[in-house]
C-alpha cells in the first residue's frame, strides 16, 4: 500500500486530498460517473433473469455448527476467486476498486451469478454493493469539505510565504540585529540598500553589528566597490582591519589599507608581516630592502626608513659576529658561555655582545665596540648603561671608570647643556646618566661589587642629601658616616653606629667621629 505523505506548507500539492495525488481513490476522479456505474451494477446484480431460486431442503440434513462458516455455491465461489473480490473488506478506499473489477468481469465474460442462499443471508458491509450510493454521498461530502479546507490552507500558505520572503526595512533589520535575532541580509541587493545598511550599522556604534554588515558587503560586492563604500567609514575600517589582524591576513589588510589611502598604515602592516622571518635574516633582509625602496620611500615614512636601515645594519653585524664566534674558543666564552644565538635580537643586544666578548678587539674589526657604535646610532645614555652592565659582569672596574669619565670638552659641554635645559644632573660623569641607575646596574650585574668602587661613584654625587640617600640604599657605611658627619647630625650618627657590626672597621670609624671634638654638631 502506498504511504500517505504528510501535508506541509512548503509543498501543498502533495497533500492526500489533491485531485492529482496518486494515493487518492478512484471515486474522486469522477464522482458522478462512479455513482452511475454503482447504480448500474446494483441493477445488474438484482435484476433480469438472475432471480433467486427457491430453496430445496437437503435429504440428509445435518446440523450446522455455529462455529462452521456457511457453505456457498461452487459457481459463486469460482466467481469470487476469479474476481479476487473480498466481500468482508470494509475499507472505504477499496470500494471503487471492487466496483471496477466487478464491472470489468461482468462485461468481459458472461458469468452466471450464483443464487443467494435463503438460509444464510450475507452480512451487508460498508463496501458491499448495497451500500455504494450512501457511501458515495458521504465521500462526496467529505471531499467537498477537504477541498474547502485545502483552499483555505493554501491561501494562508500564500500569505505566510509572502510575509516570509518580504524583506524588512533597513531600520528594522538593524534593530533585530542589535537584539540578537537572525536577519537575512541577502534580500538587500541594490548598492543603495547596502550603503544604507553600513551607515545605519555605523550609527549604532556596535562593533558586532558593524562587523556582520562589513562581512556581508565584502561577500556580495566587488573589491573596488567594497573599498569605495568603506572609504570614509572609520569605525567600519577599524573593525575590518582588526578582524584581518586577528585572522593573520596581512596581505589582504595591506591591500585594503592602500585602497582607502592609508599608505603609512599599510607600510607598517607590510613590515609586521616580515616578523615571521625574524630568525631568518637571509629571507627578511631582502624583503626589508625592497620595502625600503618601495613603501618606505615616501616623505611621511622618513623616520621609519631610518629605523629600517638600522635594523638591516644590525642584521649584518649579527651575521658577522656569529661567523667570527662560530668556534667559541675565547677566554670569555669559556667563562661566560653563550646560551642562545644572536640572530634576531635587538640592537642593544648586539652592543652588549660586542662589549662582553669583543671589547679588546681592534677598532677596525667588524665586531669591535667602536665599529658597532658607528654602524648603529645609539642613545648615549642607553649605550653607556649597556656597556657598563657588560663590563660589570666581567669585573672590569677600571674600564668602567674610564668609560664614565668625560673624554673631550665637547662631552663636558653637552653635560652642562642638559643642565641649562632643566634636566637634573648631579653626577660628575661626562654622559647624562643618573647615579641611582648606575648603582642599580652595578648591583644587578655583579653579586658583590667592591665597596671602594661604589664609594667612588657616590663621591661623584654633588648633592649631599642624594648622596646620603644612595649610601643608605646601597649599604655603603663609610659614605653614610661621612655624610652624617658633614651634616653635624650626632643623634643620627649615634643611632646608625648601633646598627653596625661590633668591632668592625665601620663601627670604629663611627665611634671616632662621635668622639672627635673638632666636629661641630647640631
UniProtKB/Swiss-Prot annotation:
GO terms for cellular component: cytoplasm; early endosome; late endosome; recycling endosome; vacuole. GO terms for biological process: intracellular protein transport; oogenesis; spermatid development; vacuolar protein processing; vacuolar transport. The keyword Electron transport does not apply. It comes from the Eukaryota. Residues 47-68 are annotated as: Disordered. Keywords: Cytoplasm, Cytoplasmic vesicle, Differentiation, Endosome, Protein transport, Spermatogenesis, Transcription, Transcription regulation, Transport. Disruption phenotype: Mutants produce spermatocytes that complete meiosis but do not usually form functional. Show defective vesicular biogenesis during spermatogenesis with morphogenesis failure of the specialized Golgi-derived fibrous body-membranous organelle (FB-MO) complexes. Show disrupted processing of endocytosed proteins in oocytes and coelomocytes. Expressed in spermatocytes and spermatids (at protein level). It is found in: Cytoplasm; Cytoplasmic vesicle; Early endosome; Recycling endosome. Interacts with vps-33.1 and vps-33.2. Associates with the homotypic fusion and vacuole protein sorting (HOPS) complex, impaired by vps-33.2. Proposed to be involved in endosomal maturation implicating in part vps-33.2. May play a role in epithelial polarization through stabilization of apical membrane protein content. May play a role in transcriptional regulation. Plays a role in lysosomal trafficking, probably via association with the core HOPS complex in a discrete population of endosomes. Essential for vesicular trafficking during spermatogenesis; required during spermiogenesis or sperm activation for the morphogenesis of specialized Golgi-derived fibrous body-membranous organelle (FB-MO) complexes. Belongs to the SPE39 family. This is Spermatogenesis-defective protein 39. It comes from Caenorhabditis elegans. The gene is spe-39.
